Amino acid sequence: ILDSFTLLTAELTAELTAELTARKKQYSYYRDTLIQKECKSEKVKLNTVCEIYDGTHQTPKYTNGGIPFVSVENIDDLYGTQKFISTEAYAKYKIKPRIGDVFMTRITAGIIGKCTVVERNDDLAYYVSLALLRPNADILDSKYLKYYLESVWGRRELSKWILWDATPTKINKDDIGRVLISVPPLDTQKRLVQVIEHFDVICTDLNIGLPGEIEARQKQYEYYRDLLLTFAETGSTLMT
């Protein structure tokens, strides 16, 4: 019985995991298809429509509280960082993040070009492994920039400048500015962002539900496994 239940749980978990992977691929395909339609627009160097900075090149002295400090490991959750620096250290930052800025991973063993749009005006210190992109709001929408750089088309452009032999891999700040990006009219960018975000919400809801289902199935398996083992050891009657 236990072997059969183990096999059933493993098969179900594999199916749910495959579904989660499929949803992520579906989102990426949909985003890339929408971006591709805009690749016919005029391409410009990123540094002509965007200011580009990077963070401190020195590992800071961390404090128990103060100003949140982020690096590539925080790209998915900027405000969840557990590292802080003093207000005195932060005062030395010449460029402080503000709403509409875009953080992009630029030095990492992971993915170069992963982005997050800054949505708060809270103080936030950042490391050299992150580039801070400040789009010209009259020309370039922040979220469009994020989606473009994360698309297959943006990654192709970034890959031309990535130093693949470096450890970890990186793209120099000045080379980020040489990346070509398609810039359709601003209203077109905003419409595209609206469509991608709508689809993103759908995929995110599914992605939240599927891992929860996998965890629930695992807990269910562990419960019945322990119950069966207890029954086998004691000869007790199984209770429901």
How does the language model describe each region?
Residues L124-A131, W164-P185:
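A short glycine-rich beta-alpha junction/loop motif
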Residues T33-T56, G209, E213-K219, Y224:
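Non-catalytic DNA-recognition/assembly elements of restriction-modification systems
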Residues I1-K24, S28, L145, G177-Q218, ...:
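Amphipathic alpha-helical segments
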Residues S71, Y93-V152:
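A short beta-sheet element
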Residues N47-T59, E73-D101:
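Sequence-specific dsDNA recognition surfaces
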